[in-house]
Design a protein with these regions (language model features):
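Active-site region of the double-stranded beta-helix
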Residues: 5-9, 17-18, 22-148
């Protein structure tokens, strides 16, 4: 908050690029999202279940958000952050990272049914926070997108 570079050492675009281009990621380790359309994993996952790097790059250029699930498994700085937070909160902590192209939106309005700590390390985003739509949502509970815009 008002310290743009405070968390810049946690993860960079170059780190994400190195993970995507340098590792043989499988479906589930990387996903794509685009608020403007539904994306199928068939668009960026090959028949063996591996991520098609060229397709990921093309979809990113067209506005898709790159999601690295469990990114702390690939990034020592994120692993250290998770271990520190686990020590502080006595709870399991994991990281998912999101790289969204400028002027794009990865997700439509939604809520998470688990606790989330957001750390934005680069760029700008207008965040909209709403009152709790449901006091204690449970996994799989429906969300009415038109109700929260």
């Amino acid at each position: 908050h008002n310290e743009p570079g405070r968390f810049s050492g946690l993860l960079t675009i170059d780190d994400v690029d190195s993970i995507v281009t340098g590792l043989d990621l499988k479906q589930g380790q990387l996903a794509l999202a685009d608020a403007s359309r539904d994306l199928s994993a068939d668009e960026y996952v090959d028949a063996a279940g591996f991520i098609d790097r060229g397709a990921v790059a093309d979809l990113y250029r067209r506005g898709a958000t790159i999601i690295l699930n469990q990114a702390h498994q690939f990034t020592p700085s994120l692993a250290r952050l998770c271990r520190g937070l686990e020590h502080t909160f006595s709870s399991h902590v994991q990281t998912n990272t999101y790289l969204t192209p400028p002027s794009a939106q990865g997700f439509r309005t939604h809520y998470d049914n688990h606790d989330v700590l957001v750390i934005q390390v680069e760029g700008e985003k207008a965040w909209r926070l709403y009152e709790k739509p449901i006091d204690t949502p449970y996994r799989g509970e429906g969300f009415e997108p038109g109700k929260y815009q």
